[in-house]
Design a protein with these regions (language model features):
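Structural signature of hydrophobic alpha-helical transmembrane segments
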Residues: 1-10, 58-75, 125-140, 199-210, ...
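Core mid-bundle transmembrane helix pairs that form the ion/substrate translocation pathway
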Residues: 8, 15-19, 170-296, 328
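C-terminal ends of transmembrane helices
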Residues: 12-26, 73-91, 142-157, 214-226, ...
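Transmembrane alpha-helices that form the ion-translocation and gating core
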Residues: 23, 45-46, 84, 88-153, ...
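Small-residue-rich segments of transmembrane alpha-helices in multi-pass membrane proteins
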Residues: 32-44, 96-110, 163-177, 232-246, ...
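Alpha-helical transmembrane segments and their lipid-water interface positions
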Residues: 35, 44, 48, 71-75, ...
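Membrane-interface junctions of multi-pass transporters
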Residues: 39-89, 222-231, 241-321, 343-346
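Membrane-interface alpha-helices at helix entry/exit sites of multi-pass transporters
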Residues: 90, 96, 153-175, 191-194, ...
Length: 358
């Protein structure tokens, strides 16, 4: 009962906050995140009044399943950006920019935090600095997609943005696995090249294969139904199914592996939109159906913020260095690579800024 009440409060409070933020011309995502902080355990939730907020992080965690499913819908929707007709126009540019800007962010953060280590070795170790550099490669697909949807943005910049955000996940998986493996080797003096390379490779290839197979099966099953409502229900069921299957872990050659729910659902959407003649209508319907779920996702994300970390000045300083270095890496990497592949000045100027959310 508490979880249902918190779910209702999160959605209602988030929607009401968007009306306030719209006066300042701020996106709904910002309103949802601020709402989450306000009704989270550190503000109104601290009062312990039922229906006023999340009294504990356990209550926030109780809604984590909604967040997982919301990410599945986001990835499914991003898959729609990989239509073959569109990839013929921007695919090469998106691939080059996507890889280079991610590597630039990794390099900038690694250098900045390693320098910080030499200044304060008692606070930040080199393995931790390297791991944070790998995390810097990723861009938040949920934030990007929701802002694009809200403002109905279209054009060359948007056409490049969403595929690049999608590629970030694959690049981030490899970068994190390699960086974390190096960091672990530095800590324990054990280095396994197989585990560093095999795990992300299996995760990426396995996720893409699972998503592609599911997209093919979904397309075949859609032809069995004549009702658009039933077809929509089938699409939604497959997204839930992929999110659930992505939680399965397995071992290959002694290496622990798993699936990436983002890549699985993204590939599901990519295959579905390219081979199913009904995909346009069904994906639009799925987007509308998932809108309340995305709102709850961002409110829960805000409620998960641990405000107690701001009481530790050194951690705040590390965070500031990380944000500045990552922002510089994303912006410079996107600008330089966009110029190298011949994008127009508008793309060169603004693409890096649009890749800052994490």
């Amino acid at each position: 009962m508490t979880a249902i009440l918190n779910l209702a409060v999160a959605l209602l409070a988030g929607l009401l906050m968007t009306r306030i933020f719209s006066r300042w011309h701020l996106p709904d995502v910002t309103a949802f995140l601020v709402t989450g902080v306000l009704i989270g355990p550190f503000v109104l939730g601290r009062l312990g009044i039922p229906g006023l907020g999340f009294a504990s992080y356990d209550q926030v965690e109780a809604l984590s399943m909604i967040s997982d499913v919301a990410m599945g819908f986001i990835a499914f929707s991003i898959g729609n950006e990989f239509r073959l007709s569109q990839l013929k126009k921007t695919g090469k540019q998106a691939m080059i920019i996507g890889v280079l800007q991610a590597l630039a962010a990794l390099a900038f953060v690694d250098v900045a935090l390693v320098i910080f280590h030499f200044l304060r070795p008692d606070v930040l170790s080199v393995p931790a600095a390297i791991t944070l550099g790998a995390i810097a490669t990723a861009t938040a697909p949920a934030t990007t997609l929701m802002v694009v949807r809200q403002y109905k943005a279209k054009g060359e910049l948007t056409d490049l943005l969403l595929p690049i955000v999608a590629l970030d996940d694959a690049v981030g998986l490899i970068a994190f696995a390699v960086s974390f493996g190096i960091a672990r080797a530095m800590d324990s003096a054990q280095f396994s090249l197989a585990s560093i390379l095999l795990s992300p490779l299996i995760e990426i290839v396995g996720s893409l294969l699972l998503g592609a197979l599911a997209g093919f099966v979904l397309t075949k099953l859609e032809t069995m139904f004549r009702s658009n409502s039933n077809r929509l229900s089938l699409s939604i069921a497959f997204i839930f199914l992929m999110v659930g299957l992505s939680a399965v872990d397995f071992t290959v050659a002694g290496v622990d592996c798993g699936f990436s729910p983002l890549l699985v659902c993204m590939m599901l959407g990519t295959v579905f939109c390219n081979i199913c003649p009904l995909s346009d209508d069904l994906m639009n319907r799925a987007d509308k159906w998932s809108t309340p779920m995305l709102a709850v996702f961002f409110v829960v994300s805000g409620a998960n913020l641990r405000l107690s970390v701001f009481s530790q000045g050194v951690l705040v300083l590390i965070g500031v260095v990380y944000i500045i270095a990552r922002s510089a890496g994303k912006y410079c990497g996107a600008r330089w690579s966009a110029k190298a592949v011949g994008c127009d000045h508008t793309v060169q100027k603004y693409l890096g800024i649009m890749l800052l959310p994490q």
